[in-house]
A protein has these predicted regions:
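Glycine-rich ThDP/TPP pyrophosphate-binding loop and its adjacent helix/strand module
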Residues: 1-156
């Protein structure tokens, strides 16, 4: 709702900046998110882009089992948003989605980014237990080694 207020303020003030907000699939279980989404579409806030991290995990388990907001794309479309679905692990898809969102007129845009929680760290991938937990020293070293190896592969 803060991002919606910022986007509305920009529109009313004749400003050209865009507003971006990041939401989790667990977070969008909250009513305030949908009230803001409805308002943003009603006001045609095409300067607003919401990126929804869709990994189906939250601190207490599977998003679908706790309080399912699925199907997310259809819900945002029903609320009057432009929807772009991407793989959150593809830099090309991320870049294209932000470009498309910035060019779309008349509606706010929701980028639904399908992701894997902890991607790139073998013992963290797809585990909700890491939502609010810090790794110990040994785990940290292993995680950094795995991420550095992945980075080296990308740069090769």
């Amino acid at each position: 709702s803060t991002a919606v207020g910022m986007a509305l303020g920009a529109k009313l003030g004749g400003k050209s900046f865009r507003v971006y907000t990041a939401l989790g699939d667990g977070e969008i279980q909250e009513g305030q998110v949908w009230e803001a989404a409805m308002f943003a579409a009603a006001k045609g806030l095409d300067n607003l882009t919401a990126v929804i991290d869709n990994n189906n995990l939250q601190i207490d388990g599977s998003v679908a089992e706790v309080n399912s907001p699925y199907p997310i794309p259809e819900k945002f479309r029903a609320f009057g948003w432009n929807v772009i679905e991407i793989c959150a692990h593809s830099f090309d898809e991320i870049d294209a989605a932000f470009k498309a969102a910035s060019e779309f007129k008349g509606k706010p845009t929701a980028i639904i980014a399908k992701s894997i929680k902890g991607k790139g760290v073998s013992f963290m991938e797809d585990q909700c237990s890491w939502h609010g937990t810090a790794p110990n020293s040994e785990q940290y070293e292993q995680a950094m080694a795995e991420l550095q190896a992945a980075l080296a592969e990308l740069e090769a």
